[in-house]
Every structure is written in structure tokens, then in C-alpha cells.
Amino acid sequence: MSVNPRYKVLFDPVKIGPKTAKNRFYQVPHAMGAGNDMPNTRAAQRGIKAEGGWSVINTGYCSIHPSSDDRPLPFARLWNDKDIASHVPMVDAVHEHDALAGIEFFHGGAYAANRHTRMPPISPSGIQEKVSELVDMHLTAPKIMDKRDIKNLIQWHLDATERAIQAGFDIIYCYAGMGFLPYHFLHPTFNNRSDEYGGSLENRSRLMRELITEMKAVAGDKAAIAVRISTDELLSFKSESSESEAHEFFELNGELPDLWDIKLSKWSKETPSGRFAEPGHMEPYNGFVKKLTKKPVVGVGWFTSPDIMSSQINNGVLDMIGSARASIADPFLPNKIAEGREDDIRECIGCNICASCYNQGIPVRCTQNPSMGEEWRRGWHPEKIKTKSSDNSVLVIGGGPAGLEATLSLARRGYSVAIADSEKELGGRINKESMLPGMSSYKRVTDYRVSQINQLDNVDIYLDNTLNPDDVLELGFDHVVTATGSSWQPSIMDEKTAPVAVPKTNSIFTPEDVFKGCQLKSSVMIFDFDYYYMGGLMAEYIKDLGHEVTIITPFEKVSPWSFNSNEVEEIKLRLLEKDIKVITEHRIIEIEESSVRVNHQITNKQTDINRGSLVLVGHRKQNDSLYNALKSNQEALKESGIKTLQNIGDSNAPGAVVHAVYAGHLYANTFDQEDDISSEDFKLEYPVIQ
């Protein structure tokens, strides 16, 4: 098969200064949680994308000086010549597949807490941007930069440019985005200088012009110089000579760098989850740039399909299709389009688990692509898997994300697999959760795996089949794995946060009951002590059904873990927009027929609140009765010829969908090893002691 004519435009080469990208697929800089501490992990992950057809592969943010220290978050570093070596493996891995390697320079300015280096932050005017999340807070106000500091900043960029060229990078970024130092020079709120670097936009952009010009002089024909810039706030600032300060900026500086990479000033707005944005949501912020420059323009926008990608090119919005999340979910997306295999694309679901990994300081993970982050330490590959080691057969019980991933990966290895599920449709929890507001993209977890399984002739599917232990013993499979999910339980929590069971009544429900269409009263109270999305989603869903909704949580906000996935503020806004009453820092301690008694988490003050129906969201229990029954009868397992029995996914340890998919993939990769899969057989990266 060959590329669909509609998508040929995506494979045009693009000249970027002295370099040429072989197509328009551009992996923009994105954090991957490895930094300089895990050079092999970084190289393998970026190299896989180059193998998959991306023409440009960039690092995440790379600090150029100790005054831009972002610990404890895992940033890349190019402070001195000793840092060069850690970048070379990535550059080599990218070049091996005829792709360009880019590096994104980062100076955080007032944002950089410098917790490790203990240097004072620096900024144009000594103004610290106030934030609401603890991880971004620090106690040191920035120093006001003098002319010497500005000269030093430029020199740090030039020194880093020379080091990047030594490492072999093809594209070098000057980063004027988010709340970082070059951006603060552009921003009238954070730059109130009275010298030639402040005042008019022409003056405020002077530093950028000097950085770009001098970096280009150092790079020569060895590397292109790109600029990554946030436009949303500049678009809101009035200009005396143009439509906005953003327009004026590009009119002044549009031809200076070799490429423009457009982003927003706030990461959570640029990379919202699929609950809160549609593909192409960035067009209001990047669609004007091409009219003001002849240089190539790249931008993101949660592009997951070749149709919207090609439309961005054909409609003159972008020159190159920028991607972070789609390149994580399917590193081979470009090659699949080139080969006419669009139906085989593993589409990003927009869950932002990848973003959450950076915010937690760990290597990036992906719900759709369980090999992400495991390329080096486990040797996993998104499109290849080791062949079977025997002719044994495998029975997978449960058709949710864990069971589907196990089935697909086992079948790709060459095993004969049967998957049985008690429902009439494969999907498990995905079928329920994808019906909630904004969650339809989660169906891609099921759709991808079912479509791939249907192309294989070594998988048998048995739906509407509830197997009991005797059935399993009689079926004659060599290996059995249960992936039977978990169920929400009717429970509240005690003062130690342990779940306390609550008797079910005709007015007390769980999400399981809501999914089944239980009869709710006009007023519904939700007690949510789950960290993640279910409580807020239940509130939205029930509100959309026409009920009045109150949500009570013991935490400071609803769905607090969702800060990690860049969703917590959007969740808060959505609840406010839907007029859902939120009571935080309270837990239910008693339930009466028409009221609940709540206890304030700080003051211990108790209050009675009237209620209608009550939905309890917080504790899930493994559906492991089948597994336990089989496991308890080892003699019967032996007599029936079952060599191994495993329990995976939510039926083993309830978690997010990403954990279930990973569990299925891990099982398929390791079930025929001599060692138990609980023995973590992966490589570690060790520091060199000097």
C-alpha cells in the first residue's frame, strides 16, 4: 500500500535554514522525564520516533546555566562541556533514521527556583509570577537584571549553542514561551524597564533579536535556529501599529529565525485533555503567523488524524505538524500514513497521563502505547514483539483494557488465544467511562485493539460468556489469565482514609449503579474520595440528566490528582459552569435516610446536610472471585493441564486505564518466562562516579 493522495502534502520536504526536514511531521520539544540522568532512556525513546518516520525529533527543555535549575523536576542540562556526552546517544539514535535532532534551550528566569544550585532567580524587573500550585512555588524574589546580566544571558546561549553543535544537533531553540526569561522580556506585565530593553514592544523584543542574531552567527550552516514563543497573551495586548502586540512582534521579527514554533503561555491551556478540547484548538493562536513570515511555522493542536493534519497545511495554518502526545501514542504514525495504513494508527486519547509523568518527575508513560518509556530498560518496541517460545494456548478472561492488550500482544507473538467476556461487547470499563462527558476519546483504547485483533486469525472471541471455575478447567487451555476488572463499592472513609462499607439502599448508589441507569431522585449528593476523574465526571453526567448535584470531597479540590494531568483547573471551571455545588475538606461520617452528617477535615466541626440520592465514589474492589477459586484448587489446575494462572489489571490492583493496559502488555511479554512476572527484570541507568 502507498500513501493516500489526500495526505501526500504531509510528506513534502521542508527547508529549515541550512537543514531540510524530509517531511512535515515534527515532534516538538516535550518533556519525557529522563533528563541527563537517563541518557539511554532518552535516546531510545526519541530514536523510536525517528524510526517511525518523524522528520524532526526534539529534546525536552534543556537548561543552559545553573541559574536555570528546575529541580526536582527532571530537566535536560547543557551547563558545561561535560554535559555534551549525555546528549550524543539521542542525536545518534535520531540520525540513524535520517531525521533531524533538535534541542530546546531553557532559561527559567523568575520561574526557576534554583533549589539545587541556590542561585538567585533573575528577571527583567524583579517581578515574580505568582502561582497556585505548591510544586511551582518558591520563596526567592528574582534579582533585577542589569546590563551585565543581559550580556551574560546572551553568552550562556552562545556557549550552549557551541555545545549543542558539538553534540550534533541540527536545530537549536531559543525559548520565549510560558513564564520563562526571554518571554518575560516580551511581556509588559513583567518588563517595566526604562532602558533600551523595556517600554515599546520593539525595545522589549530587543533581547530576542540579539539572541537570535548571535546564535545564528555561532551556528552558521551547522544548525538551524528556531524560536518557540507563546502568543496568547501577546494577542490580548493592544498595539498602536498593528492588530495586536503578537502581530506587531512578527512584523518586526518574522524573518529572523529559521523556524517559528507557536505555543501558549500556560501548559494546561496548550495541552488540555480530551475532556476539554478538540483537535485544532490552537488555531486561534497560531493561525495568523504564516501571514507575517516566510519562515516555516510549526504548531500543535492534538492532531490525531491525517485529515486534520493535511487540512492544517492545505489551509495555510501551519507548515509542519507539531506533535507531542500523538507521537507518544504512536511513534510510527508518519510511516503508517505513508504506507496507507491509517486504520492502524494508535490514536492518542488525550488522557494526559504523559503530562502527569513529567509533573511527577518520572519517565513518560502512555495509556495507548505501553512500550513508551520502556524502549531501553525492557527493550520493548511499539510495533515489534518477540515471537512465541512454544505452541501453548492462552485463555484470557475479561475483555477490558488489560484483557484486550494481553490478547493482542499474545496473538502478535504467535500464540493461539481465546478471549471470553461476560458482556455482549468487548471493552470492559471503557464502555462505561467513555459515555461520560468529554470521555468519548477513551473508546480509542478499545477500538484500536479490537480492530487489530480482528485482523488476526489466531484469536477466538467469546462474548456473553460468564465462565465459572469448572468451565475454565474443562476448556483445555495451557495458560489462563483473568482480567475481570473491579467494581466501585458503596463505602465512605474513616479518619485514617480507610474505606468503610455502607449498606446499599434504594437511595445509595455507586458509579456502577449510575452506569446501569438507576433511578435517582431530583437532588443528588456525591461523596468523592477518589483522587482522579470519576467524582467530577459523575457530577457532570448526573447534572446533564437534569438533577441538582452537590459534590462533597475530603480534599481541597475535586479530583486533586488531576493537577498532574493538567485538568484540575478545567474540572473546577466545568463544575462551576454547570452550577454544581462543591463542598471541599469534608467527609461523610454518618448517613441517614434523608441527610448526611459531615465532618470538617481541619476543624472537626460536624454539620448535617439534607440529601436525596447519594452516590459514593472512592473505593474499587477487585473482581477476583474466579481467579481465587481457580488458584485455591491447584490439584484441579494440574489435572486440567493448566500450566500457569495469572491475574492482571484492575482485578489484581485497581488503577487507571494506563495501568491496566500496561499490565496486559507486561503479561504478554513475560508470561512464558521462567521467572514470575513480579520480578522486575529491567535495566537501570547508573551515574558515573568521578
Predicted features along the sequence, with ranges:
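Short gly/pro/ser/thr-enriched loop/turn and capping motifs at secondary-structure boundaries
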Residues: S268, S327-D330, E425-G427, Q489, ...
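Rossmann-like dinucleotide/flavin-binding elements
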Residues: K388-I419, Y462-L473, T484-P499, T505-F563, ...
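Flavin-dependent oxidoreductase catalytic cores
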Residues: M1-I397, P401, A406-V417, Q489, ...
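Short beta-alpha connecting loops at secondary-structure transitions
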Residues: K269-R275, P296, D319, I430-G438, ...
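Generic beta-strand/beta-sheet core signal
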Residues: V28, E104, Y175-G177, Y183, ...
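N-terminal Rossmann-like dinucleotide/flavin-binding domain of flavoprotein oxidoreductases
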Residues: G428-F477, S562-R587, S594-S595
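Flanking helices and flexible, charged tails adjoining ferredoxin-like Fe-S electron-transfer domains
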Residues: I212, R377-S389, R412, S416, ...
